[in-house]
Design a protein with these regions (language model features):
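Phosphate-binding site recognition
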Residues: 1-332
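A cross-kingdom feature that marks ATP-driven nucleic-acid transaction machinery
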Residues: 2, 297-424
């Protein structure tokens, strides 16, 4: 993969001069396995930051350093800065990789660790031959640590990698390996539940859940990891404000996508929360109609993560069924809403597929001031002046190309493109 190439190139570069890389990505995306794959067969030290006291953490790290690198540090180290200094000194003699996983958790251990790392890094980087990688899954904290001008580690990075879920073509291939006779319905269900997150695909495939019905059976079984996963992922991200954030995400997942609708249900202005969800947490996107101006007020909000969208649509609102152990009724709720909900996911699937496969410079949807005259997919190429305009329906027989053609005529900006109509 592209990320693996960047990591290997950085490793090579770090033999000459110290490199500092950050890798960010949601939990379960496969950061750790990718990092370990990139340093296979080389000298490396992997440290995992857990929420514990600094002396206890250092005790564990001291043991890890002795085992992985043979560094003997006499006496008991109780401050991370002392250990980090020893690791940097070691790298002036021997080249190796230092991976610190869940790096943002240092904030809960001792927040001054970041400035201590910065001081020591600035002091030793000229002579160190170290490939230092900080990996983290709480997006907001990682961005604050490395991209906020007021933070000590701002401007210290050699490179930054944001790990994304698998592309459509990749998880299609994976499903085909496990079930060569899969149907489009099976593929859509896999996309709807996992969004291409490797760990979720893995859980389903390893359990033999390669068909739609089996996938939904597994997700709604009493021991399903998918039931509590949404809460596990986000409570630590949001802290004590999580109640309001969860309510907003539940409303967006249920189809209330305009801020005024959200404000009236929540009973207060949700603007600041929505801005945080988009900028700090990267969980939502403010969608504007294609060709509209940046200051357009016709915005609609959507969730970026397919699994979380599914969780907020079906699992979170039905906690009472789960607490009563009525998993059969939870499955019934999903079955009833499946047709309509998966139709919306299908639009997203085709947007991802077109973005991956076609030569385009922009992609989105269209609706007018009244929220009418909707077009599911408009993909444009400003270099060739071509556009793909598509209507997406679960039942392609319901697509009327004449209506789509008349919608195209009503969007004056499309007049300068050679338009190809598609029914998907």
């Amino acid at each position: 993969t592209q990320e693996l190439e960047i990591l290997r190139r950085t490793w090579e570069q770090s033999k000459q001069s110290a490199c500092f890389t950050v890798m960010v990505g949601r939990r379960r995306i496969g950061k750790t396995s990718l990092l370990l794959e990139s340093v296979k067969g080389t000298k490396y030290l992997y440290l995992f930051v857990s929420r514990t006291s600094e002396p206890l953490l250092c005790q564990q790290f001291q043991k890890d350093a002795a085992e992985a690198l043979g560094i003997q540090i006499f006496g008991t180290i109780t401050r991370f800065r002392d250990l980090f200094e020893q690791l940097l000194i070691f790298s002036t003699k021997k080249h190796y990789t230092l991976i610190i996983d869940e790096f943002q958790e240092f904030a809960n251990v001792n927040s001054s660790i970041f400035s201590e790392i910065q001081n020591l890094w600035d002091q030793y980087k000229g002579k160190a031959k170290i490939n230092f990688i900080a990996s983290g899954s709480i997006y907001s904290m990682m961005m604050k640590i490395f991209e906020n001008r007021k933070e000590p580690l701002f401007g210290r990075l050699t490179s930054k990698i944001t790990l994304q879920p698998f592309a459509v073509s990749v998880f299609k291939e994976i499903l085909n390996d496990y079930n060569p006779r899969y149907t489009p319905e099976d593929l859509l269900c896999l996309y709807m539940l996992t969004g291409g997150v490797p760990k979720y695909i893995d859980l389903l495939m390893e359990a033999g859940a390669t068909k739609k019905s089996k996938m939904l059976d597994m997700v709604t079984s009493p021991d399903s990891p998918f039931i509590s996963e949404g809460k596990d992922l986000l409570v630590s991200e949001f802290g004590k404000e999580y109640g309001t954030y969860f309510s907003i995400l539940q409303l967006i997942a249920s189809g209330k996508t305009i801020q005024s609708e959200l404000d009236s249900v929540i009973g207060k202005n949700t603007g600041a929360y929505l801005a945080n969800l988009e900028r700090e947490y990267s969980l939502t996107t403010k969608n504007r109609p294609m060709f509209s101006r940046p200051e357009s007020r016709k915005n609609r909000w959507s969730l970026n993560d397919n699994y979380l969208q599914f969780w907020f649509r079906f699992i979170f609102p039905n906690q009472s069924l789960i607490e009563m152990g009525k998993y059969d009724l939870l499955r019934e709720v999903i079955d009833r809403g499946y047709e309509q909900y998966s139709g919306l996911v299908l639009e997203k699937y085709f947007r991802s597929k077109i973005a991956e496969e076609e030569r385009i410079t922009g992609i989105g949807s269209y609706w007018n001031n009244k929220g009418e005259n909707e077009i599911d997919v408009i993909a444009i190429n400003d270099l060739d002046k071509t556009a793909i305009v598509a209507e997406v329906k679960r039942n392609p027989k319901k697509i009327d190309m004449n209506i789509l053609q008349s919608k195209v005529h009503s969007v004056k900006e499309l007049a300068k493109y050679k338009v190809e109509l598609q029914g998907l």
